[in-house]
């Protein structure tokens, strides 16, 4: 999982889901797990 300042480009990938957990924003992608990221 990468830590990114901005998740804007990752949100647009096919199969992406934006999830908020414990105050952090995550992008999860089951189709293509290399796009997994956390903001901050």
From Swiss-Prot:
Stored Pfam families: Ribosomal_L36
Gene Ontology BP term (one): translation
A molecular-function term among this protein's GO annotations: structural constituent of ribosome
Superkingdom per UniProt: Bacteria
InterPro entries named among the record's database cross-references: Ribosomal_bL36, Ribosomal_bL36_sp, Ribosomal_L36_bact
GO cellular component terms, semicolon-separated: ribonucleoprotein complex; ribosome
Alphabetic keyword roster: Ribonucleoprotein, Ribosomal protein
Family label: Belongs to the bacterial ribosomal protein bL36 family.
Protein name per Swiss-Prot or TrEMBL: Large ribosomal subunit protein bL36A
Source species of the chain: Kineococcus radiotolerans (strain ATCC BAA-149 / DSM 14245 / SRS30216)
């Amino acid at each position: 999982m990468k830590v990114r300042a901005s998740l804007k480009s990752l949100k647009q990938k096919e199969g992406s889901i934006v999830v908020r957990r414990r105050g952090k924003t995550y992008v999860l992608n089951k189709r293509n797990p290399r796009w997994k990221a956390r903001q901050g």
